[in-house]
Amino acid sequence: MYAFPTTRIAPRRKQPKCIKPPKCTSKYDIKFKDIAIYILERKMGASRRYFLMELARKKGFRVEPDLSEYVTHVVSEKNSGAEVLEWLQAKKAGSIPNVAILDISWFTDCMGAGQPVEIERKHRLTLQKICVCKSPSPVVPSRVGVSQYACQRKTTLDNKNTLFTDAFEILAENYEFRENERSCLSFRQAASVLKSLTFTIAGMADVDGLPGFGDHIRAVIEDLIEDGESSKVSEVLNDEVYRSLKLFTTIFGVGLRTAEKWHRLGIRTLEEIKSNENLKFSKMQIAGLQHYEDILGGVRKAEADAVAMVVRDAVWTFLPDAVVTLTGGFRRGNKTGHDVDMLITSPIQGKEKELLHKVINLWKKQDLLLCHTIHESTMDEDNLPSKSVNLLDHFQKCFAILKSNQHRGEISSCDGPHDSRERGKRIWKAIRVDLVFCPFEQYAFALLGWTGSRQFERDLRRYASHEKKMMIDNHALYDKTKRVFVKCESEEEIFGHLGLEYIDPVERNA
């Protein structure tokens, strides 16, 4: 028998959640009144969701900004049926009757047809029934041995805690905009830890013992567990500064400083940017505005493979023995991405230095190049690896926008709202491409660095410095104790010299 205290302890009063997501004020004629679409932001991001909502509305579809009893179709991208169902239940919406839970492919087909299409089996997300029976021997998830370093954790794309990591990434981005580096890193590190877990956080006890989970982070988790949403995240999403900076930085060539300047000038929309005659744009920003819809729509794996072949063909025209590798998120197994990262080298020393300008000139002749900027190499082979975890490397690079010559009917019609006249003429899509040229002896380090993820590389550098008295960047590995550079011909060798278990690229999604 428990002895209850005579003094009554008042429960903690939760902050009322009076902040609601902004309602869309756009007005379009609704042609198809029998369906109401809700687009799930989870794993998609606010900017892309807004773009898709507006695209559907322009085509006469009814799109609900919030989940309600009116919704007939829930559309999701890169989520499993179980993940969507879990999210709906967290929103107390699991009992909405007759709602169709669909993959983005159904939405894509509708946009292409200009009308609702029949739901086929391929469109439906598979839902697993959740057993509510009590287990006599519940399995307690283990948090023992979760390293503070992402390079000691295996992190696949099977993120079981997206409710929390999505919230953390919004907060981290807001802190980045506010230049609060410490809080930004704290939330990104916490998100990275949760992505590596093999179980879903169900209670506060599940985060006990996890590295880097302070009071601020735990408070957000507690809100999400209890209510399925966070007042802090809602505040950020409704903050005018955040929304402006988020929108402006989605434009290719626009950094934080430019975004802040535009916001101070009272600019809030893309239309205001385009119509402001007093603004001066770089050539990259002009291209970013011209091809905004294509670039915001992202790149699919098939498109990345097609672009990679274009790059290989161009490089091999001048140097047949060159090594040309698709890196970045696609090497980590992602099906979509923001751009295409290509790493290029040659076993013949110095030959890679001659390639870039030849490739650029070839693409100009082929009318494939929409825009580009070149950063020449600033490399000094005698320099030690950088101590900074943020500093970019010194390789020769080209940041470009290429035409991907594929029929737009084969590309998701979600990639941009083009009118029928433009669709009739254009058979290409604008895709961002980053080319990086490195010496062959540095290829292993460059491959490791450009594969990512960003948090994985950050923690790899921290681990090398703090635990092994070594320094590593995209160029080299240096042993501070022996005062020597450590030669490595592969990623496996780099992991070995650092005393780390080798982690496959598809497990580096920290």
Swiss-Prot record:
The answer, when asked if Metal-binding is one of the entry's keywords, is: yes
Q: Name one GO molecular function term.
A: DNA-directed DNA polymerase activity
Name this protein carries in UniProt: DNA nucleotidylexotransferase
Its annotated compartments are:
Nucleus
User: InterPro entries from the entry?
Assistant: BRCT_dom, BRCT_dom_sf, DNA-dir_DNA_pol_X, DNA_pol-X_BS, DNA_pol_b-like_N, DNA_pol_B_palm_palm, DNA_pol_lambd_fingers_domain, DNA_pol_lamdba_lyase_dom_sf
Its catalytic activity? Answer: DNA(n) + a 2'-deoxyribonucleoside 5'-triphosphate = DNA(n+1) + diphosphate
UniProt lists the gene as DNTT
- Entry annotated with the keyword tRNA-binding: no
For the region Involved in DNA binding, give the residue spans.
254-258
Q: Which residues bind a 2'-deoxyribonucleoside 5'-triphosphate?
A: G329, F330, R331, R332, G333, N334, H338, D339, V340, D341, G449, W450
- Quote the record's binding site residues for Mg(2+): D339, D341, D434
What is the main EC category here? transferase
Name the UniProt key words of this record, in alphabetical order.
Answer: Magnesium, Metal-binding, Nucleotidyltransferase, Nucleus, Terminal addition, Transferase
